[in-house]
Amino acid sequence: MSHCQRNTDSDWNTIRAHSRASKKNLKKVWCETKRNEPKYVKLGSFEKIYVSMRKQWKEANSGIRGVGPLTCYDLCMYICKKYSVSLNDRVWLMGYGPQRAANKLKIWKGSAECKKCNITGESYVMLKDVVAAFQKSTFEYDKEKVKNGNEDDVESYMCCWENELRKKD
């Protein structure tokens, strides 16, 4: 039985949640990503892995629709976590949730700034700036998740946190 036949791990569930591709097509993407793990790991950085995936899965190249930036980010994070590829303390603002959270937290006031990566074209903020913004804010938040989370955990938390705030309004 192929290692791609059964997908029960949380990475698969996250990728499915963010993808607009059909389950069948997404399974092809997932299996191809798993097969190419060694190639991606050799690239050595989140940025290079992400760009490689975006090129591979752009609709025109792969013929599979619905594999956008968020799905590529999730696939890239799967590899980065599995092989301990550093994000260099960058919290990537993938999608509107983390971007809105960063605006609500006023992360860009003062010394912190939103940076755009020259390699990926995506925006990010530094983890320390996100932690400091939460600590300075008057909003309720999960102190443990923010203080002890890695870059991807904090990005996910920002998305969920912002979503909960919108529901309360």
Question: What is each PLM-predicted segment?
Answer:
Residues 6-65:
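Helix-hairpin-helix/helix-loop-helix acidic hairpins
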Residues 36-50, 54, 73-169:
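C-terminal accessory module of base-excision DNA glycosylases/AP lyases that mediates lesion recognition
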